[in-house]
Amino acid sequence: MSKPTTLYDKIWNDHLVHEADDGTCLLYIDRHLVHEVTSPQAFEGLRATGRKVHAPEKTLAVVDHNVPTTDRTKPNPDPESIEQIKALADNAREFGIEYYNEFDKRQGIVHVIGPEQGFTLPGTTIVCGDSHTSTHGAFGALAHGIGTSEVEHVLATQTLIQKKAKNMRVTVDGKLPDGVTGKDIILAIIGEIGTAGGTGYVLEYAGEAIRALSMEGRMTVCNMSIEGGARAGLVAPDQKAYDFLRDRPKAPKGAAWDAAMRYWEKLRSDDGAHFDHELRLDAAKLPPIVTWGTSPEDVISVTGIVPDPDKIADEAKRLSKHRALKYMGLTAGTKITDIKLDRVFIGSCTNGRIEDLRAAAKIAEGKQVSASVNAMVVPGSGIVKEQAEAEGLDKIFIKAGFEWREPGCSMCLAMNPDKLKPEERCASTSNRNFEGRQGFKGRTHLVSPAMAAAAAIAGHFVDVREWR
């Protein structure tokens, strides 16, 4: 009888080309997603050495980081962005790669379009020159970010050199209370393990609460695995995953689908499989969460207060949290619900999908954005935007005073016109609250879409569980 293995072990073993004596491995890569920021040097490297893209049919390119989310018929104000966008278009054409430009309905954030096109599939290995590639693990794919030199290596060989990570299982038992979401689950996990707790691991998310999440919710959880320090995050595929992918443009069809299903149904950790570390959370005890500092581990319940760093024993950590408080312009002991906001951003590869927009629209309907807040909603892709408009969500947002934008990474990161001004405070559905992440000296609080929408209307954080 074979030894019980984890889901990660199974996918790894199925893609292992070679293992050296020192544990360095060569792994076959099934899918490669490419965007405009981390690819120019990689293509230049291919050109300089006379190489071709080894498997252009397994490569998909899209612009997302630098594109403006306003009217795209008007000139892009940033010369560097123009150059990177043009470079990707030229490289895709030269090397024979399918490419979605900023005017293509299929364009969007790379980690939104992969699943919605059926390019992301269970049991595959997926890489991209972007840290949030872990998103695709929601479908039972082994997916993680790579550096620019590795982008070149994968383009040239369809393989990647790496060492195997350890296994960690995070089991979330119980049922989530109303108003608590997948975003709150992953923020709670990061708050528990810290931003380095997952270092050297691939995380598998399991348990009743994870199974109850939609595919959008699972993508949110897997998306932020990297913020917990993990290499990747995984959820074993089930009927929800299959239903999501069925009939997608790039998903298998007919007999090929049936054959794929026979493989996919085996993609789960065996009973008795060894995990190097286990963590359990009770979903029923989770509140809506807000980050207060400059690290995703700086989490607190919306009903809580800004913590006092002086109560931290470790000196380095104490000084770090004091710095965070100063940067954020907050005082220990302040109620989270007393924190006033200047901006609200609903979107990103964490929370820019149709379910996220529906949740925000449900809160916003019939209400009005606070006069002190500038709020914007940025769909994760052209397909999401089209669906939202078909459901009338755009009208709900616009009537409530939100800006309704074109798809892209937008205010998740300060690489396009959507930026915070110095000391502006933003409730954001994105994944990182680092210093300067959304703009020079900008202050970011991470929340769920419903929490962000409620904060936009109230002008400060509110407990969405009590929203009327």
UniProtKB/Swiss-Prot annotation:
Binds 1 [4Fe-4S] cluster per subunit. Its cofactor is [4Fe-4S] cluster. Keywords: 4Fe-4S, Amino-acid biosynthesis, Branched-chain amino acid biosynthesis, Iron, Iron-sulfur, Leucine biosynthesis, Lyase, Metal-binding. Coiled coil: none annotated. SUPFAM superfamilies: Aconitase iron-sulfur domain. It catalyses: (2R,3S)-3-isopropylmalate = (2S)-2-isopropylmalate. PROSITE patterns: ACONITASE_1, ACONITASE_2. The keyword Cytoplasm does not apply. [4Fe-4S] cluster binds at residues 349, 409, 412. InterPro entries: 3-IsopropMal_deHydase_lsu, Acnase/IPM_dHydase_lsu_aba_1/3, Acoase/IPM_deHydtase_lsu_aba, Aconitase_4Fe-4S_BS, Aconitase_4Fe-4S_dom, IPM_dehydratase_rel_enz, IPMI_cat. GO terms for molecular function: 3-isopropylmalate dehydratase activity; 4 iron, 4 sulfur cluster binding; metal ion binding. Its EC number is 4.2.1.33. CDD domains: IPMI (cd01583). Pathway: Amino-acid biosynthesis; L-leucine biosynthesis; L-leucine from 3-methyl-2-oxobutanoate: step 2/4. The keyword Zinc-finger does not apply. GO terms for biological process: L-leucine biosynthetic process. Belongs to the aconitase/IPM isomerase family. LeuC type 1 subfamily. Heterodimer of LeuC and LeuD. Catalyzes the isomerization between 2-isopropylmalate and 3-isopropylmalate, via the formation of 2-isopropylmaleate. This is 3-isopropylmalate dehydratase large subunit 2. It comes from Bradyrhizobium diazoefficiens (strain JCM 10833 / BCRC 13528 / IAM 13628 / NBRC 14792 / USDA 110). The gene is leuC2.
